[in-house]
Amino acid sequence: MQDMLKDISSELRSHLMPLDFFYSKNNSKLPKISSIKDVKIPDVERNLLAHHNDMTSTLSKFHDSDLYIEVLNNQFNDNYLLRMVVLKKTKDNKPVEFGAIGINLSSLDNSMVNEINVGRKPLGKLLEQY
């Protein structure tokens, strides 16, 4: 990962760590990744990608549907969870996003951790709820 991402900021690299973990675990290479300025992204895509809101509510509004996750893979380590998921629309089960996330469970409410472990609701939805 380091060679491919040498021109990307350390902050972006840290966001890619969960994805890199699962790709490495499966002996797969990450797809080509580059950073671009948000002004170079077309309007519709920019509204979906370049914002300060949570991604779950942004995608839910755009697709006019609640979302759920399909967990493709996960890894627990003490109170830290890495998971790779597909977000899907509840109204037709179509995928709208693929991604991986790291979640520090130690500071979260027990009922929220239980829902995270069930693996059905996106983290953004749970953060709204709790």
Regions found by a protein language model. Name each.
Residues 1-82, 86-130:
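N-terminal domain-onset segments
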